[in-house]
From Swiss-Prot:
Any single GO CC term annotated in Swiss-Prot or TrEMBL for this entry: plasma membrane
Name this polypeptide is given: Type IV secretion system protein PtlC homolog
Taxonomic placement: Bacteria, Pseudomonadati, Pseudomonadota, Betaproteobacteria, Burkholderiales
Compartments reported by the entry: Cell membrane
Species: Bordetella parapertussis (strain 12822 / ATCC BAA-587 / NCTC 13253)
Gene3D superfamilies linked to this entry: P-loop containing nucleotide triphosphate hydrolases (3.40.50.300)
Gene: ptlC
Keywords: ATP-binding, Cell membrane, Membrane, Nucleotide-binding
């Protein structure tokens, strides 16, 4: 150091730094939700959820646009100004889950590693109302005592409350959940008694680029905010904190487009870098606004090559202004792009400028007054707003449309945490649940609707999605003392490998092969006796010829006789032996039932004995677990389909005892084509939620599902709908049958078949989500269940002779790789 008036080695750096307190206008918290500035302006901020624009109908988007314009008109006066921030920042996404099953643990770990390879992003909107009492009020403060000042402040706060109430009422329509559509930022106290301000937390982020809780200070706010050193260069700023350095560069509008429409800047919502977009708008008086339009029209009239249409447009704008269709105000825009590397930051700036210019705006990097653009992000910082322009409230509403993405619900669902975390094209995480519940409600333990419909053509990834969700469900086996039971009604064995990897039981019902079913070994309860009466009466029908009352009585007596025997003796053949043949009706009853008995009573074997005349009943859903039933063969056998279905569904009802329960139907149209399944599905759609259960239906044939006798229940009683890509989707099926909107239908058609994308719809909200398991070959082989994998699976079981997945999975993967390499 030079002791004679010299400069330190860091003097040059110090000259580039700013004492930021002078640039921060805030004095203190006046109330929990309101700040007051040194100039007596009042500041209040809300977080706005926004609308899921991807699938919103154009009419809805236009309606919301006009609502915003109407709101800005309603609150416009010289005392009111608005700051709106769109913040795109990195976020930590993930779900804490514990899986007992080794395959589920491995799948979840691989999947999360893939998700984490791409940084999750989130978009947040903040609306700040600035209320300026005006110079007259300031003058009064100077000439009156504290009591008068306090009275004036309370009056201003009440006026701000009135405006805020109108804002909240209007913006609650900008999200399906009305309570969380807009939430005011206030103060909260932690368990140690420390008070934190969410408003100051937002302002600190604008100053530092870091999101961290900020305590309510005892002293002035301006001296408390800003924990980073701010170094301003010619075109870039450095925000230096004790832990890292961040760089920032600004963009603003040099020229505006010829028109605006809602969502003009939506392309920026998909970018993979962090940024803060700031809009401010302060209305001017009608006289000043009209004078501005008249000057613009006069200037155009003096230009020889001016388009007459532009002059006419301004004339119409004058009329609209006078009629109150919009207001005009001073507007400013800035986009602060953040990054850790200056070179990457420049590339991100270039990308942002391209996106903006594609919409007709001329964007330019901010090089003059860079620090002014930085501090103008702070609400009520009037003096620093660069490149102000006059803009209508309708155009302002188009630039700030609060368009966002539906993010699902992470916590507080009926079964606790979200079922799964899915990626989206925007990078924003989507927390998927079968249940649909209010975003701001803690619904844990509530019995709510969770039925789900999955529609996807062959090859669209439907089987993989179903099996993946089945695996993700296994977290609830560990989380609940009552456990979880899933029953998968499968087709073409698509879920067999997966269910066996979960150490579940999988039953293939094939014509002529013993099923392992024996209904007569059910416990002798009133409910079971009634069921057996009904089932056996069906077996004894001949060509839809009903039993006589005498035959019903004979059959009922035999059933009750057999049920009093030890379980090992109860069989269909035993039942037949307990029917007397004193009358022709009784003999006819024996003849009909004989077809279902190993001993048909006439010295032969009944053709259908394999269905129910088995030594032991192997069907048991009483214990929590995963069960699969392949219906490929028996669903096409009209004679055995309904009796088998009746028994399966009766036993399944036993599992719906309050534990978490899910039944899944692949190619549901085929299952519900049977009357027993149709009746069950129709009834359970309405009542299963009361038993803490839900049903998941999938199909590649919408027409068959919509043509089912219970189609109305399957369509109307679904909380969640999933639509996989289908370029050949039939308009009538999707719009009239499934009640999709035109926008949703076009999304379903436009998604590439190999994109791994699908549309998830819950209530009025929808999102394009993605399940991309590329590179997870081992996991996909178990989830996909194709013919080649099934052959390798059967060979692996034969070689290991074990049901334990730990034994056969490794062999399965070896055989699969050998088959791919042409070694087998």
């Amino acid at each position: 150091m030079n002791r004679r008036g010299g400069q330190t080695a860091f003097a040059a750096i110090a000259r580039n730094e700013r004492a930021i307190a002078a640039f921060i206008p805030y004095s203190s918290h006046l109330t929990d939700t309101t700040l007051i500035t040194h100039g007596a302006d009042l500041v209040r901020t809300w977080r706005v959820q926004g609308i899921a624009f991807e699938s919103a109908e154009p009419e809805l988007v236009s309606q919301r646009h006009e609502q915003l314009n109407g709101l800005w008109r309603a609150i416009s006066c010289e005392q009111v100004a608005l700051w709106i921030h769109c913040i795109r920042r990195k976020t930590q996404a993930g779900l804490d889950a514990r899986y007992e099953n080794p395959f589920c643990r491995a799948l979840d770990a691989s999947y999360n590693a893939r998700l984490n390879a791409r940084q999750a992003m989130t978009n947040e909107f903040y609306l700040t109302l600035v209320y300026r009492p005006g110079h007259a009020a300031l003058g009064k403060r100077a000439h009156h005592g504290q009591a008068e000042v306090r009275r004036q402040l309370l009056a201003h706060v009440r006026r701000m409350d009135e405006i805020g109430s109108l804002i909240e009422t209007t913006l609650r329509s900008h999200g399906e959940n009305h309570e969380q559509a807009i939430t005011v930022l206030g103060c909260e106290t932690d368990s140690a008694g420390r008070r934190y301000s969410r408003t100051l937390t937002l302002l600190e982020f604008l100053l530092t680029g870091h999101w961290q809780p900020v305590r309510v200070p005892a002293g002035p706010v301006d001296a408390y905010l800003g924990s980073s050193r701010i170094l301003a260069g010619a075109e870039m700023m450095e925000l230096r904190s004790p832990t890292c350095r961040r760089y920032a560069q600004f963009i603003d509008f040099k020229e505006y487009g010829t028109h605006t429409e809602p969502g003009m800047l939506n392309a920026l919502l998909y970018e993979d870098y962090e940024y803060v977009i700031t809009h401010s708008f302060s209305a001017v008086g009608k006289r000043q606004a009209l004078a501005y339009l008249q000057r613009q029209r006069a200037q155009l009239a003096n230009v020889q090559d001016a388009a007459y249409s532009q002059i006419d447009d301004l004339a119409h704008a004058e009329d609209a202004l006078v009629n109150g269709d919009f207001v005009i105000g001073e507007y400013h825009f800035s986009m602060m792009i953040l990054g850790a590397d200056p070179r990457q930051l420049r590339r991100d700036v270039s990308s942002a400028m391209t996106r903006i210019q594609e919409r007709g705006f001329l964007a330019t990097p901010v090089t003059l007054a860079l620090d002014a653009a930085f501090y103008a992000q702070l609400p009520a910082n009037w003096a620093y707003r660069p490149r102000k322009a006059m803009l209508t409230s309708r155009n302002f509403a188009g630039l700030c449309s609060f368009h966002n993405f539906y993010g699902g619900k992470r916590d507080g669902n009926p079964w606790g945490p979200a079922l799964s975390l899915l990626s989206t094209p925007s990078g924003q995480p989507f927390y998927f649940n079968f249940h649909h519940s209010g975003l701001d409600e803690d619904c844990r333990g509530q019995m709510m609707l969770g039925n789900t419909r999955i529609i996807g053509q062959s090859g669209s990834g439907k089987t993989v999605l179903l099996n993946f969700l089945l695996c993700q469900l296994q977290k609830f086996r560990s989380a609940d003392a009552d456990g979880l039971t899933t029953i998968f009604f499968d087709k073409d064995r698509g879920a067999e490998i997966c269910i066996r990897a979960l150490d579940g039981q999988y039953l293939r019902i094939r014509d002529g092969e013993p099923t392992g079913f024996n209904p007569l070994q059910l416990p002798c309860t009133d409910r079971n006796v009634m069921f057996l009466d009904s089932l056996l009466a069906m077996l004894a029908r001949a060509h839809d010829s009903p039993l006589t009352s005498a035959q019903h009585a004979t059959l009922a007596t035999a059933v009750r006789t057999v049920l009093r025997m030890p379980a090992s003796l109860r069989r269909m053949s035993t039942l037949l032996q307990n029917i007397t043949q004193a009358t022709s009706e009784q003999r006819e009853l024996v003849r009909r039932l004989g077809r279902w008995c190993r001993d048909d009573g006439a010295g032969g074997t009944g053709m259908l004995w394999w269905v129910f005349d088995n030594p032991n009943d192997c069907l048991d859903f009483s214990r929590p677990g995963n069960y699969g039933i392949d219906g490929t063969a028996f669903l096409d056998n009209a004679e055995t389909r309904t009796p088998i279905s009746m028994y399966l569904l009766h036993r399944m009802n036993e599992a719906m005892d309050g534990r978490r329960f899910v039944y899944l139907m692949d190619e549901a149209w085929k299952w519900i084509d049977d009357p027993a399944f149709a009746e069950f599905a129709g009834d359970q759609q309405l009542t299963i939620r009361k038993k803490n259960g839900l049903g998941v239906f999938s199909t590649q044939m919408p027409s068959s599902l919509l043509g089912a006798r219970v189609a109305a229940s399957l369509v109307q009683q679904c909380a969640t709908e999933i639509y996989l890509p289908n370029p050949r989707a039939d308009r009538a099926e999707y719009l009239d049958g499934f009640k999709c909107t035109e926008t949703e239908y076009q999304l379903i058609r436009s998604m590439a078949e190999d994109s791994h994308l699908f549309l998830v719809k819950q209530g009025r909200q929808a999102v394009v989500a993605q399940l991309d398991l590329s590179g997870m070959d081992d996991e996909l082989a178990i989830l996909s269940g194709n013919a080649r994998n099934l052959r390798c699976f059967e060979q692996a079981l034969a070689l290991t002779r074990e049901r334990d997945p730990n034994d056969w999975i490794a062999v399965f993967h070896r055989l699969r790789r050998e088959a791919s390499a042409g070694l087998r």
